[in-house]
């Protein structure tokens, strides 16, 4: 079995790319996990969504592929309007940064990456049993070329 260089995976590189954005948007940012969202607030997770990865297959043998991820966060949650508006505002700003970075060629350091985009706006997913924290979610897509 081959040894996997986990630091060189697309999901790890995407996490590295997102870290400075999170540090800018949330001074209490802790960590981006892979396929795991902790129970404390200010935790984030990148979860790969199963989709067909091949978008195009060229005659030259080049393939255009994509990965789709659910980027989830656990945030404070309550009936307080201001708190919930902050959660919504976080994802609006996050989406603007991702779109601007893509337009300006600021992309994750992934081999042959062509683009990154948010496929939706961040949205409430679920609240915990106490109603004090909630999971929010936005989908990210990267498109890359395989030669």
Describe each model-derived feature in a short phrase.
Residues 1-38, 52-147:
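Charged, amphipathic alpha-helical segments and their flanking helix caps
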Residues 42-52:
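Charged, often glycine-rich, active-site loop that binds/positions anionic groups
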